[in-house]
Design a protein with these regions (language model features):
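Terminal targeting signals and extreme-terminal segments of soluble enzymes
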Residues: 1-132
Length: 132
């Protein structure tokens, strides 16, 4: 499976996959929370970016867990904002809780560069064949 970066990941602040654990079916990605992603005088990242970072990590977990056969199409996504996210490096984790033939259940977390928990997420995703 290709790990080529695409335009969306660049727009989200880099989006590089830094680790994948086969046993845990867990993807870890790093992003840069840029000042232009922020409101409140540049101190707080807009929640859509926080959500997208965790969604991307969960989608990578599906791609890897299925050996590149499936992509995740989000059906439902819940996010809990634990603490304000500021500019700087952030780490998104996403993992497969359960994967059936057509639907997967996923969870994710977002941390700042010091390891502080910023947000959590859970998602239900439809499995879509990458190359039908």
């Amino acid at each position: 499976m290709s790990e080529n970066r695409n335009g969306l990941m660049e727009l989200l602040g880099g989006g590089s996959l830094v680790e994948y654990n086969d046993q845990a079916q867990k993807a870890v990605m790093q992003f840069e929370a840029r000042p232009e992603f922020c409101h409140s005088d540049g101190r707080v990242v807009q929640g859509g970016f926080v959500t997208a970072w965790m969604d991307a990590a969960m989608a990578h977990a599906i791609r890897r867990a299925s050996q590149g056969e499936y992509s995740a199409v989000t059906l439902e996504l819940k996010v809990t904002f634990v603490s304000a996210t500021g500019p700087g490096p952030v780490v998104a984790e996403g993992w497969v809780v359960s994967m059936g033939r057509t639907v997967a259940f996923l969870e994710g977390r977002l941390f700042d560069g010091a390891g502080k928990l910023l947000a959590t997420s859970s998602s239900t995703a439809k499995l879509a064949r990458v190359n039908p």
